[in-house]
Amino acid sequence: MPPPRGEVLQGTLDLIVLKTLDALGPLHGYGIAQRVQQVSEDLLKLNQGTLYPALLRLEQRGWITSKWGVSDNNRKAKYYSLTRSGRKQLATETATWERMAGVIARLLGAEGAG
């Protein structure tokens, strides 16, 4: 059964966050969520209960750093940035995802197999 609209596939949240920060540079949590929603054409929505624990976990692993700043609407916000270690992890996770997507594509195209 496919995940309900808006849910991130299990195991892809770190990849999505790392890639978003790699593409756009420092962003606050709301900015990350908005960008993911925009790029996915509203298919994926990162809620606070999912996103902020992930950001904390990524920071604890040394893949991102955070720093307080002021948002466009003059509010205090924590901005997250990708680290060198985070870029390496992004490359690893991207390669793993591409391998798995290839396997799934082959399985879906294997009509009559089995």
Residue ranges and their predicted role:
Residues 3-6, 68-69:
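Short beta-strand/turn micro-motifs at beta-sheet edges
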Residues 51-58:
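Basic amphipathic alpha-helical segments that dock to polyanions
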Residues 12, 16, 77, 81, ...:
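Amphipathic alpha-helical recognition patches that constitute DNA-binding helices
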Residues 6-50:
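N-terminal helix-turn-helix DNA-binding core of bacterial DNA-binding proteins
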Residues 87-114:
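Amphipathic alpha-helical dimerization/coiled-coil segments
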Residues 59-75, 81:
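Beta-hairpin "wing" of winged helix-turn-helix
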Residues 82-86:
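Accessory beta->alpha helical hairpin/"wing" motif in late/C-terminal subdomains of nucleic-acid enzymes
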Residues 1-3, 80:
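A positively charged, amphipathic N-terminal helix/segment that binds anionic biomolecules
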